[in-house]
A protein has these predicted regions:
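Glycine-rich "substrate-gating" loop/helix at the edge of Rossmann-like oxidoreductase active sites
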Residues: 61-64, 92-102, 118-130, 144
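Conserved beta-loop-beta element that borders a ligand/cofactor-binding pocket
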Residues: 74-97
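Substrate-positioning beta->alpha
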Residues: 71, 104, 120-141, 151
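Conserved Rossmann-fold NAD(P)-dependent oxidoreductase catalytic core, especially the SDR/UDP-sugar
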Residues: 9, 18-65, 87
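NAD(P)H-binding glycine-rich loop region in Rossmannoid oxidoreductase-like domains
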Residues: 1-15
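Conserved catalytic-site region of short-chain dehydrogenase/reductase
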Residues: 4, 40-50, 94-100
Length: 193
């Protein structure tokens, strides 16, 4: 369950970790030969690293959703170390059509359009759900061989600096969007609220 609602923090954590252990743990116990676990790029995002990759240590997170993904990832890494054939993906913000409800990333786009799009030295990284589905199909058709601990893949999609994302959203909506320069530390602090 993807929820950043602090009122649902405990439920989000328990659903994500418990559900993952039930499904992935059972698949390993049953001897399934190819398993794909969808983690989140958020488990690798942390200060002190100029660049992250699949070997970056797991982040210490406070927010329930990210913490549930981190703890689930830690569990899956333990399964990989014991030889369970799990391939792990780390998608960035997932966006795309036919969203049955407004996902967190699509909700962010709606806020950028209706309220404000930030302008910092960073940007927004997202992956189209159709591209992510294609990557998962490929992994299911091509089981990991050798060291399962190497079977971890960042699926980043596209990175848009804030000014470029603003231009793209203005082109799609046909209107000028409000943008406000925000210092990076202030913007990150806002994300923790």
């Amino acid at each position: 369950a993807v929820s950043l609602d602090p009122r649902k923090a405990q439920q989000t954590y328990e659903n994500n970790v418990g559900g993952m252990k039930a499904v992935i743990g059972s698949a390993c116990d049953l001897g399934i030969r190819n398993i794909v676990y969808v983690s989140s790029l958020s488990v690798l995002m942390q200060t002190g690293f100029d660049e992250i990759n699949e070997t970056t240590p797991l982040a210490n997170t406070r927010e329930a959703y990210s913490r549930s993904k981190r703890d689930s990832d830690e569990y899956v890494r333990g399964l990989q170390a014991r030889g369970c054939p799990v391939q792990v993906t780390y998608p960035s913000a997932i966006v795309g059509p036919d969203d049955p409800k407004l996902s967190e990333a699509n909700h962010a786009f709606a806020q950028f359009i209706s309220q404000m799009i930030p302008n910092t030295t960073t940007g927004f990284q997202c992956v189209d759900v159709r591209d992510l589905a294609e990557a998962h199909r490929y992994l299911l058709e091509h089981p990991a061989t050798g060291d399962f601990e190497d079977a971890r893949y960042i699926i980043g999609g596209h990175y848009y600096p804030w000014p470029e994302l603003r231009q793209k959203l203005e082109a799609v909506t046909g209107r000028r969007l409000f943008s406000l320069p925000i210092p990076g530390p202030v913007f990150r602090a806002m994300g923790q609220v």
